Amino acid sequence: MAAKEIKFGRTAREKMLRGVDILADAVKVTLGPKGRNVIIDKSFGAPRITKDGVSVAKEIELEDKFENMGAQMVREVASKTNDIAGDGTTTATVLAQAIVREGAKAVAAGMNPMDLKRGIDLAVAEVVKDLQAKAKKINTSEEVAQVGTISANGERQVGLDIAEAMQKVGNEGVITVEEAKTAETELEVVEGMQFDRGYLSPYFVTNPEKMIADLEDVFILLHEKKLSNLQSMLPVLEAVVQTGKPLLIIAEDVEGEALATLVVNKLRGGLKIAAVKAPGFGDRRKAMLEDIAILTGGTVISEDLGIKLESVTLDMLGRAKKVSISKENTTIVDGSGAKSDIEGRVAQIKAQIEETTSDYDREKLQERLAKLAGGVAVIRVGGSTEVEVKEKKDRIDDALNATRAAVQEGIVPGGGVALLRSSVKISAKGVNDDQEAGINIVRRALQAPARQIAENAGDEASIVVGKILDKDQDNYGYNAQTGEYGDMIGMGIIDPVKVVRTALQDAASVASLLITTEAMIAELPKKDAPAMPGGMGGMGGMDMM
């Protein structure tokens, strides 16, 4: 085991705080409508220009191991917020930095870290309740477009595209963002289906950067049972290889020798292939396999129907234009099933929804209906250069996630105003002075996002925050895009409650861990072994005794 270096108390916290500051300072410049760009060097290709907080955070790795631990903890805040809410990563980073800074000062002044944490938790719980009470529900397509526009850094067309996509496939429908072949950004709704099963082995991945497997013009084998060896499948595998097209296997499971053989064939390049587990369980799995069969024009290979794997021919396989498989989901786009068959299946599911008395069954049937009838909306992102397309795609992904979050939990005034207003409404009381200090830390930290937005726009943060708080109106705030004060919701500047809430909860959670840290352990750098001494010269002719 390698030797370790250990730092305690104040020394540890100072190192950690330095790491937090380096990462947060790089991320927070992207906040708000006048957020600046960050350029990220790539080992190959053009550098990447982005305003996406989580993309910046993911690139940061520091040389000093103790500083790096602090930076990685805050990076965790950004990714966790991104995973849950899909947006708000920069806000979460700014809040985490503010809470850690104030908390570290309080601990250095001799306060009890555990009481500070209790105070922080009390204040955060109250702010979350306040945000949920103030939330305004999203009802119209125009409101959806407004949320999308804000999250895409004020790009109105993006907001309109997202609103239209949600209108076409429903709020819970599947919307994907792809790179276009042209300079224009366009919206296309494609018949498709998504289910929550990912690839069985990461070796099936075709795009290592995003860790997804994309298969174009693909055959789909639907099998009801487990596959543990491929002997019985050889005839159909050989037939697929002859066509030169990829194959997706959807079965109860693919294990052992069968999975190993598929992986080896994929790696050797003989067979473009991927395997996923069938969605659902028991009878529902059978029904969902039937749904996929109807959507793709294939047949479920089932012993109930007397079909054996050995006798499967190409015409029994389903077909689709594209299948995209991530770690968690599989999306089948543009299956070649007959429209009349799909409509018949939809009518059948609707009839079952009418008849069922169980709420759970009804919910699952409605999910199946959405998958069959809803389709997949694809927003194709265009631009004149590859760098521009990538940057735009990041923003549209953020905007889409924010819009979904807004539909789920409602909206509050944007621009950091909701948190700013909550800061003066915190009435929680701690049982001692240290808990009170924890509550005050959150009060001050809640002003950080609004201050940062003003700073990024080149304005004096203290004046902006003072003016907003002087007016006793919940929606009154500062539009950094135009430099005007007024009703934020009226100006279309809004934040989804889910995004603001998640950002605050994640930031407080990680910041509390950092404040209550008393020791840090890291591996010492390995010392280079001393080089072997060179032989003595001029002794070639000596006789050995």
UniProtKB/Swiss-Prot annotation:
Coiled coil: none annotated. GO terms for molecular function: ATP binding; ATP-dependent protein folding chaperone; isomerase activity; unfolded protein binding. CDD domains: GroEL (cd03344). GO terms for biological process: protein refolding. PROSITE patterns: CHAPERONINS_CPN60 (PS00296). One of its GO terms (cellular component) is cytoplasm. It is found in: Cytoplasm. Signal peptide: none annotated. It comes from the Bacteria. ATP binds at T30, L31, G32, P33, K51, D87, G88, T89, T90, T91, G415, D495. Keywords: ATP-binding, Chaperone, Cytoplasm, Isomerase, Nucleotide-binding. Its EC number is 5.6.1.7. Together with its co-chaperonin GroES, plays an essential role in assisting protein folding. The GroEL-GroES system forms a nano-cage that allows encapsulation of the non-native substrate proteins and provides a physical environment optimized to promote and accelerate protein folding. Belongs to the chaperonin (HSP60) family. This is Chaperonin GroEL 1. It comes from Rhizobium etli (strain ATCC 51251 / DSM 11541 / JCM 21823 / NBRC 15573 / CFN 42).
